[in-house]
């Protein structure tokens, strides 16, 4: 709590913007209370808190495929959905422009192409782990 208060104070003192993000995670009641408390602190300080757990439908989440892997957090397939959602959210709410294909950003374009290839390989590995039930024993349940 003290670290968060210090960070919020630093941001305010230096007139800095920040977006606090909680990526989708499997949550028990105590964890949910903690994140709600953090969100309240962030909002009370005038900053935005994006809880992706509130956007399962918009993310297009498939709980059997996007969480199943090695724990109570998203796997590579779910992370790709989070990344796409977050990039759209930031572009829409913060006016950041898409620089793909523009001069001076060629290395970013190349990195993105490499990432897409690696994602396709990761999807195969994840699907295999799910099919073989070869992942952590953390229970994954759809929210009510």
Question: Model regions: which residues?
Answer:
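Residue-identity detector for glutamine
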Residues: 17, 32, 80, 114-117
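Catalytic His-Asp segment of secreted/periplasmic serine-dependent ester chemistry enzymes
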Residues: 35, 39-89
């Amino acid at each position: 709590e003290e670290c968060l208060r210090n960070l919020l104070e630093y941001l305010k003192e230096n007139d800095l913007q920040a977006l606090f993000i909680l990526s989708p995670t499997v949550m028990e009641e105590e964890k949910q209370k903690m994140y709600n408390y953090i969100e309240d602190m962030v909002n009370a300080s005038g900053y935005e808190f994006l809880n992706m757990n509130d956007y399962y439908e918009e993310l297009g989440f498939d709980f059997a495929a996007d969480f199943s892997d090695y724990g109570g957090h998203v796997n590579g397939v779910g992370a790709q959905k989070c990344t796409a959602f977050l990039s759209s959210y930031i572009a829409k709410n913060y006016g950041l422009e898409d620089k793909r294909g523009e001069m001076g950003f060629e290395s970013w374009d190349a990195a993105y192409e490499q990432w897409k290839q690696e994602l396709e390989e990761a999807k195969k590995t994840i699907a295999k782990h799910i099919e073989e039930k070869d992942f952590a024993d953390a229970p994954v349940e759809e929210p009510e």
